[in-house]
Curated annotation (Swiss-Prot):
GO terms for molecular function: rRNA binding; structural constituent of ribosome. Transmembrane segments: none annotated. The gene is rps17. GO terms for cellular component: cytosolic small ribosomal subunit. CDD domains: Ribosomal_uS17 (cd00364). Keywords: Ribonucleoprotein, Ribosomal protein, RNA-binding, rRNA-binding. Part of the 30S ribosomal subunit. This is Small ribosomal subunit protein uS17. GO terms for biological process: translation. Belongs to the universal ribosomal protein uS17 family. Disulfide bonds: none annotated.
Length: 109
C-alpha cells in the first residue's frame, strides 16, 4: 500500500520494497520540486537529471543558456530511463551526492 507524500502526484502502480522510496518506504520529502530530463541511469538506483534554464547577463542585456546536473534516487517502482522527463523532490541526504528522489516519470512525446 502506498502512502500519501503530500503532493498532487499519484502513487505508482507497482510495489517496491525500497526503504528510500517516498511511496512505499519511510523517506519523507520536503523542499524543492524540480523537473528535468534523465541523461544517465547507469548507476545502481540513481539517475542523473539535467535541467536547462536561462540566465540574464546584465552587461549585455541578453540571456544565456545554462544547465545543471542533479543526482537523484530512482526507486524500483518508478524506474526512470534515459530521455524520460521526471519530477524530483528534495529529501534528506541519501548519500554524498543524492538529496533528491524521483516521484514521477513521463515518457516524452
Amino acid at each position: 500500500m502506498a502512502r500519501d507524500i503530500g503532493l498532487n502526484i499519484p502513487a505508482p502502480s507497482e510495489e517496491c520494497d525500497d526503504a528510500y522510496c517516498p511511496f512505499h518506504g519511510t523517506l519523507p520529502v520536503r523542499g524543492q520540486i524540480l523537473v528535468g530530463t534523465v541523461v544517465s541511469s547507469k548507476m545502481d538506483n540513481t539517475v542523473v537529471i539535467e535541467r536547462q534554464y536561462m540566465k540574464m547577463v546584465s552587461k549585455y542585456q541578453r540571456y544565456e543558456k545554462r544547465r545543471s546536473k542533479i543526482h537523484a534516487h530512482n526507486p524500483a517502482c518508478i524506474s526512470a530511463k534515459v530521455g524520460d522527463i521526471v519530477t524530483i523532490v528534495e529529501c534528506r541526504p541519501i548519500s554524498k551526492t543524492k538529496s533528491f528522489v524521483v516521484v514521477k516519470a513521463e515518457v516524452p512525446k
